[in-house]
Amino acid sequence: MTIKVGDKIPSATLMEMQDGKPAPVSTDSFFGGKKVALFALPGAFTPTCSAKHVPGFVNSYDALKAKGVDAIACVSVNDAFVMGAWGKDQKADGKVHMLADGNGDFTRALGLEFDASKFGMGKRSQRYSMIVDNGVVKEVNVEEPGAFSVSSAEHILTEL
């Protein structure tokens, strides 16, 4: 079943590079007690993700904070080392938490996994964005395959 407005974010452990090492991030603690703009994408260093999706959230950091967002997070089915390197490449440090869902457990629990095997990428996350307030989904925007519009930072700003 796909996550929907009013659902609680599933409990899972993601990974984030901290002090040069992968560190576990509990979704319960990360999303608890704060408003989070969450977005996910099929893969680090892929064209749309690198040219539009991540830069949009990095560039909208101040606007999102001004609208009450406490944290911005990007999730992808990649390992923490790749997500950390990509975050540096995208100048996301200090603005967007680059969270690795290495085994896809969180993505699967959300019901937002898709099979990208025909591209040599295995199981990946669909492209989406959410507003999560104290662990509860307030808005969810899932893109059609190949599309990029409702998961953008610009769209999230209209929902706050």
What is each PLM-predicted segment?
Residues M1-L160:
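Chalcogenol-based redox active-site neighborhoods
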